[in-house]
From Swiss-Prot:
Organism: Bacillus cereus (strain ATCC 14579 / DSM 31 / CCUG 7414 / JCM 2152 / NBRC 15305 / NCIMB 9373 / NCTC 2599 / NRRL B-3711)
Gene for this chain: leuS
One Gene Ontology MF term: ATP binding
Chain ranges for the short sequence motif 'HIGH' region as given in the UniProt record: 40-51
UniProt GO cellular component terms: cytosol
Binding site for ATP: 579
Descriptive protein name: Leucine--tRNA ligase
Keywords, alphabetical: Aminoacyl-tRNA synthetase, ATP-binding, Cytoplasm, Ligase, Nucleotide-binding, Protein biosynthesis
Family: Belongs to the class-I aminoacyl-tRNA synthetase family.
Catalysed reaction equations from the record: tRNA(Leu) + L-leucine + ATP = L-leucyl-tRNA(Leu) + AMP + diphosphate
Length: 802
């Protein structure tokens, strides 16, 4: 007989809710464990089978840790601001708040149906004014510290969506949502100075237990590079520009310079003959995103300005070009080109037939670029030096002649923090008619997002908030001065930067988080989520955390001690699940047909947690069959406990049981859930063959399966006679001595050749080993004299006979 999953799951979910089984107390003597999931964006589509994979992993850990005596913080909430809700509201005329609330209710019900052990009293929602009051408070702190500032920035403007998009929201020059054209235009934007934390964000990665590949992605994004700035005068004018280079040693090999099309000097230095071509090129570039412009594989394009720069080291005149691969926002917006020794410069020079000059020996620049090390040539005072020596000497020369200086730069840009949308946190700043700007006072927070029917983009580049006169226009009660509220809103990243702190103290109206509580719970012990957030979310959260550390709000330098990215669950055809392909699997259907325990077990058994694996109905059926076998082993058809279960010990299962406890305990802790489940399957096979099942082993097994399949775990626990939940029962332990084999295989050799293999007690004495060995090879030594017997206890017996 199989178990009735619908009945059992409903029963235990009701029990947990009624008894607040997973409520986390703050005051406790127990050690702490904080298991965090990346909270979901509550989309209209609801939960998909990819969500529960990470959630089940943290849930298994949380449930095991509770049984091991830890006080576990395992919360859930909603990252609910953002573009999709606003887009839905624009398309349907409904309010984004209603849409979001409806979706959250759907998500919450779906998540509860999967039996996760969340403390729902700590639920947070980034769109709740009691929550975003503190998001705004953090913004005020950034503003006070000079880390939030306004700047004119060329942005990706999408006229159809009426908003600015981040580089990540653009694919092939079109918006990711809706595929609308995107163009570049300068706009007043709020920026956060994440670059001020570049070194700390880089150095502190070393202390974290994160996958190395993920740390490397962050290192590359921060992109620290050491080199020099070099100043170039523009021939025939008083103007000059500066370039940054990691290879100042190749300055003698520079044959031209390139400015970004947006560089401030371009209009000024372009000659009359080149004006038309330069302007046409600049207009064409406006349509491209930074990512497209810097694509390595793309065809090089550019235009000569007609102007020349003077190389400070030898007085040579170098033609100045503009090209889209140089970005105004990166470095200085200008580069010196050394085509003989730089790949990109070489390609550009080849396309436009520009000269090349060898200054480092080792290659043949008539055939290809040479980027390796070697002795310098054609370089006056650098001749004969290698790369490191030449860099040091050139920097010395640049500084002595005031032609340049040593410099460290970052690929990391400051964080563009404003969005021209309605559905986000209002930025608590007022712009006054006299040109000054002040922050809203702390006691006036939260600055609540006003309700409005009209959330169409203003079309001017401002957010829809600009349309709400009674909200936007303010008067200073003391001076009578008129002002306008900031109409930009914060990006979706803002609320997700600090939510892990609010779970610690979700109802505090006086402070972001109580200092004692935050000391108790930080850092997060394990954070599990998708790899798509590897760079931005984690970098932004680490940045905010460091700012909060600097102002004494948090006691740790880093928020997340251990981080793990789960893999992706693909469709049965190995393609990404998507509505358009029609291969999305809805967890509600699986919960109805197979049960939540089966879904949880299957997703953990599919393969390693970080692998991307195709969904399989057969695999799902197999997971259900295993749970049915477990049920049938312990429960009779009449619903009573199996008569095989007894209080007497059973030697034949002893080793298998202790092995299982050891492997499952270690594998759960290391997130190797698939191999832990395999081991439990092996144990169940052995248990079916056994005549009797010691009660201790049955209880231990039920405790081990419960974190993966909690409903069946609770039901079996109650059948074993317990009235309390299994949640806080103590985790089974294993005895190392029971894992050791009682018997060993002994090799018997005659004159060094193997003649027999014997099984005997591992404690057999030398005399016993010798006696048994001689009996076993009697026929081999007949008629010979035994000269010597060498015995290695527990291993072998070698007989010397002739």
């Amino acid at each position: 007989m199989s178990f009735n999953h619908q009945e059992i799951e409903k029963k235990w979910q009701g029990y947990w809710e009624e008894n607040k089984t997973f409520r986390t107390p703050d005051e406790t003597e127990k050690p702490k464990f904080y298991a965090l999931d990346m909270f979901p964006y509550p989309s209209g589509a609801g939960l998909h089978v990819g969500h529960p994979e990470g959630y089940t992993a943290t849930d298994i850990l949380s449930r095991m840790k509770r049984m091991q005596g830890y006080n576990v913080l395992h919360p859930m909430g909603w990252d609910a601001f953002g573009l999709p809700a606003e887009q839905y509201a624009l398309d349907t005329g409904n309010s984004p708040a209603e849409f979001t609330e409806h979706n959250i209710n759907t998500f919450r019900n779906q998540i509860k149906s999967l039996g996760f052990s969340y403390d729902w009293d700590r639920e947070v929602n980034t769109t709740d004014p009691n929550y975003y009051k503190w998001t705004q408070w953090i913004f005020l702190k950034l503003f006070e510290k000079g880390l939030a500032y306004v700047d004119e920035v060329p942005v990706n403007w999408c006229p159809a969506l009426g908003t600015v998009l981040a580089n990540e929201e653009i694919i092939d020059g079109k918006s990711e949502r809706g595929g609308h054209p995107v163009e570049r235009r300068p706009m007043r934007q709020w920026m956060l100075k994440i670059t001020a934390y570049g070194d700390r964000l880089l150095e502190d990665l070393d202390e974290l237990d994160w996958p190395e590949s993920l740390k490397d992605m962050q290192r590359n994004w921060i992109g620290r590079s050491e080199g020099a700035e070099v100043h170039f005068n523009i021939d025939g004018t008083d103007e000059k520009f500066t370039v940054f280079t990691t290879r100042p040693d190749t300055l003698f090999g520079a044959t031209y310079c390139v400015l970004a099309p947006e560089h401030a000097l371009v209009a000024e230095i372009t000659t009359a003959e080149q004006k038309e071509a330069v302007e046409a090129y600049i207009n064409a570039v406006k349509m491209k995103s930074d990512l497209e412009r810097t694509e390595l594989a793309k065809e090089k394009t550019g235009v000569f300005t007609g102007a020349y720069a003077v190389n400070p080291v030898n007085g040579e005149k170098l033609p100045i070009w503009i090209a889209d691969y140089v970005l105004a926002t990166y470095g200085t917006g200008a580069v010196m080109a050394v085509p003989a020794h730089d790949e990109r410069d070489y390609e550009f020079a080849s396309v436009f037939n520009l000269p090349m000059k060898e200054v480092v020996k080792g290659g043949d620049i008539t055939k290809e670029v040479y980027t390796g090390d070697g002795a310098h040539v054609n370089s006056a005072f650098l001749d004969g030096l290698n790369k490191e020596e030449a860099i040091a000497k050139m920097i010395e020369w640049l500084e002595a002649t005031s032609a340049g200086n040593q410099k460290v730069t970052y690929r990391l840009r400051d964080w563009l923090f404003s969005r021209q949308r309605y559905w986000g946190e209002p930025i608590p700043v007022i712009h006054w008619e006299d040109g000054t700007m002040t922050a809203v006072k702390e006691e006036e927070l939260p600055l609540v997002l006003p309700k409005t029917e009209n959330i169409r983009p203003s079309g001017t580049g401002e957010s829809p908030l600009a349309n709400i006169d009674e909200w936007v226009n303010v008067v200073d009660p003391e001076t009578g001065k008129k002002g306008r509220r900031e109409t930009n809103t914060m990006p979706q990243w803002a609320g997700s930067c600090w939510y892990y702190l609010r779970y610690i103290d979700p109802n505090n109206s006086e402070a972001l988080v109580d200092p004692e509580k935050v000391k108790q719970w930080l850092p997060v012990d394990i954070y599990i989520g998708g790899a798509e957030h590897a760079v931005l979310h984690l970098l932004y959260a680490r940045f905010w955390h460091k700012v909060l550390y600097d102002i004494g709000v948090v006691p740790t330098k880093e928020p997340f001690q251990q981080l793990f990215n789960q893999g992706m669950i693909l469709g049965e055809n190995n393609e990404k699940m998507s509505k358009s392909k029609g291969n999305v699997v809805n967890p509600d259907d699986i919960v109805a047909s197979h049960g939540a325990d089966t879904l949880r077990l299957y997703e953990m058994f599919m393969g390693p947690l970080d692998a991307s694996i195709a969904w399989s109905e057969n695999g799902l059926d197999g997971a259900r069959r295993f749970l049915d076998r477990v049920w049938r082993l312990f429960v009779q058809d009449n619903g009573e406990l199996s008569e095989k279960i007894t209080d007497a010990p059973n030697k034949e299962l002893e080793k298998a049981y202790h092995q299982t406890v050891k492997k499952v305990t270690e594998d759960y802790a290391e997130l190797r859930f698939n191999t832990a489940i395999s081991q439990m399957m092996v144990f169940i096979n052995d248990a079916y063959k056994a005549e009797t099942l010691p009660r201790e082993y049955v209880e231990g097994f039920v405790k081990m399966i419960a974190p993966v399949a909690p409903h069946i775990g609770e039901e079996l626990w109650s059948k074993l006679g317990y009235n309390e939940t299994i949640t806080y029962a103590s985790w089974p332990t294993f005895d190392e001595s029971k894992l050791v084999e009682d018997e060993v295989e002994i090799v018997v050799q005659v004159m060094g050749k193997v003649r027999a293999k014997l099984t005997m007690s591992k404690d057999a004495s030398k005399e016993e080993m010798e006696q048994l060995a001689l009996e076993a090879i009697q026929d081999q030594i007949e008629g010979k004299t035994v000269r010597k017997v060498i015995v290695v206890p527990g291993k072998l017996v070698n007989v010397v006979a002739n």
